[in-house]
């Protein structure tokens, strides 16, 4: 079995986002798997962060945008790790993706799909 030198980050909260960006900026290809429809985790629900009371969205939003735009990151939102096989340095991971009902590569964030469903 050939070795595919890539990294899997499970969880798209602020820690997973930071890990994915750090690894991608170091030249690794990163697969970021998040079980919810969007990344951001609990931090996306907060107004301010502790202990500095910095604006949570001001920290998180640029990082979320950077994940989507980074050529070394493949984002699989609304997905879960179903199985892990292999050995150290050569794993095979099965990811189960939930249906999105949109073509993600064509999405420009216009929210017209939400209007169609409401």
Identify what each model region corresponds to.
Residues 44-79:
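N-terminal glycine-rich dinucleotide-binding loop that anchors FAD/FMN and/or NAD(P) in oxidoreductases
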Residues 65-73, 78-81, 85, 96-108:
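A structured beta-alpha segment of the ubiquitous adenosine-cofactor-binding alpha/beta core
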Residues 1, 94-95:
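Short, structured interface segments
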Residues 13-16, 53-60, 106, 110:
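Generic structural signal for well-ordered, non-membrane alpha-helical segments
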């Amino acid at each position: 079995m050939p070795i595919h030198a890539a990294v899997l980050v499970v969880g798209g909260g602020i820690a997973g986002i930071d890990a994915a960006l750090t690894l991608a900026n170091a030249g690794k290809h990163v697969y970021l798997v998040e079980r919810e429809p969007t990344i951001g985790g609990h931090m996306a629900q907060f107004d301010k962060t502790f202990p500095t009371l910095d604006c949570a969205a001001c920290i998180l939003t640029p990082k979320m945008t950077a994940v989507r735009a980074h050529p070394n990151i493949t984002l699989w939102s609304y997905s879960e790790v179903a199985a892990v096989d292999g050995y150290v340095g050569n794993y095979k991971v099965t990811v189960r993706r939930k249906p999105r009902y949109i073509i993600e590569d064509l999405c420009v964030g216009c929210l017209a799909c939400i209007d169609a469903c409401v």
